[in-house]
């Protein structure tokens, strides 16, 4: 919906009749809903709020009315959308059916809500994680995904990787020189030290005729190589990917293709094993949207919800395994931590 002016929003808040402190508390909760759950209905959000605040602080009708105000308020890292806006065929106008959606689940164009749909599907049947202390929930007013020990270790490891300055085809063969946003070679630089457009991003930019659209995409894609890799890991782990049957092996293959193919990083056996281990640990110890805030290691040591029992290695992983037979054993061990068996070819 179209954002409202500050003056109009001020009048709406005044009409709601709640104190500034209560409005501030609600904004904090909304940030936590977005960061912790990814997507949650206003109805369920009310139940979470009531679990910690009771019913004395705010009436449900005022909670619902607040959702309509913040829906038109610009500058938030989340959106409040009507159910019928996200799902064709829905006609409900009940404000309780609105969805609080983290902005990273909303794309553009035809697949605008693809990640939203995928996340909602994987959330089905799972309870929301509700910590005993309200303070532990409200600690999520900022995105904490890479602030954990496991997240920091992943960032540290990726930050140490260097590019050889060549992009590769799907067979891993060099095809050209990688250039940064200013057209300079990036060979020898670490991932945080250069920004570039990947080949798929370049295709996206060239697809549009509108210069305004092109410029918007250039700004959106103008991230360092490290940021692009972290974004990929974040999206894959939080949502499980767009495909309902996407496996950890497939996600790892896509990550390796990004590192090797688009960013010119050649991993040694030791580095590949380290990456696989960090990926598994980050997955197991993170509060994931697809689990409604639960960590996989809190949901039992059996097979993780939404993950397959078996998978086959893709071309990139097969190549790593062929270089050293021990790599396969290590990869199998890491997958076993997720309750997954690597199938024989």
Range-by-range predicted roles:
Residues 52-97, 254-257, 261-288:
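Charge-enriched amphipathic alpha-helical scaffolds
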Residues 24-28, 43, 61-64, 227, ...:
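Non-catalytic, well-ordered alpha-helical scaffold segments
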Residues 39-50, 59-61:
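Short acidic, hydrophobic short linear motifs in intrinsically disordered regions
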Residues 16-20, 39, 57-60, 220, ...:
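Alpha-solenoid helical-repeat scaffolds
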Residues 2-15, 19-21, 64-133:
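Charged low-complexity interaction tracts in eukaryotic proteins
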Residues 15-41:
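Positively charged, polyanion-binding regions of nucleic-acid-associated proteins
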Residues 131, 135-139, 143-342:
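Extended alpha-helical interaction scaffolds used for oligomerization/partner binding
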């Amino acid at each position: 919906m179209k954002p409202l002016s500050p003056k109009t929003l001020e009048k709406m808040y005044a009409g709601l009749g709640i104190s500034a402190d209560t409005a501030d508390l609600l904004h904090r909760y909304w940030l936590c809903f977005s960061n912790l759950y990814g997507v949650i209905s206003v109805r369920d959000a009310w139940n979470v709020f009531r679990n910690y605040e009771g019913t004395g602080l705010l009436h449900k009708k005022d909670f619902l009315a607040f959702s309509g105000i913040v829906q038109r308020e610009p500058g938030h890292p989340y959106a409040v959308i009507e159910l019928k806006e996200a799902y064709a065929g829905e006609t409900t106008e009940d404000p309780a059916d609105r969805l609080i959606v983290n902005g990273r689940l909303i794309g553009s164009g035809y697949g605008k809500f693809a990640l939203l749909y995928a996340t909602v599907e994987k959330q089905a049947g799972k309870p929301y994680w509700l910590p005993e202390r309200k303070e532990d929930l409200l600690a999520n007013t900022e995105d904490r995904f890479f602030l954990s020990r496991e997240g920091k270790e992943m960032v540290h490891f990726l930050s140490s990787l260097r590019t050889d300055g060549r992009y590769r085809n799907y067979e891993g063969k060099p095809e050209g020189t990688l250039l940064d946003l200013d057209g300079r070679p990036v060979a020898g630089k670490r991932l945080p030290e250069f920004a570039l457009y990947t080949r798929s991003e370049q295709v996206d930019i060239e697809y549009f005729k509108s210069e305004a659209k092109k410029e918007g995409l250039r700004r959106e894609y103008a991230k360092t190589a490290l940021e692009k890799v972290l974004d990929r890991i974040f999206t894959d782990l939080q949502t499980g990917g767009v495909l309902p049957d996407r496996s950890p092996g497939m996600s790892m293959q896509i990550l390796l293709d990004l590192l090797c193919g688009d960013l010119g990083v050649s991993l040694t056996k030791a580095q590949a094993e380290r990456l696989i281990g960090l990926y598994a640990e980050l997955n197991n110890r993170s509060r994931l949207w697809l689990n409604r805030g639960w960590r996989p290691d809190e949901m039992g040591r059996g097979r993780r919800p939404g993950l397959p029992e078996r998978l086959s290695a893709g071309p990139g992983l097969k190549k790593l395994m062929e270089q050293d037979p021990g790599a396969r054993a290590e990869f199998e061990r890491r997958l076993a931590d997720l309750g997954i068996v690597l199938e024989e070819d």
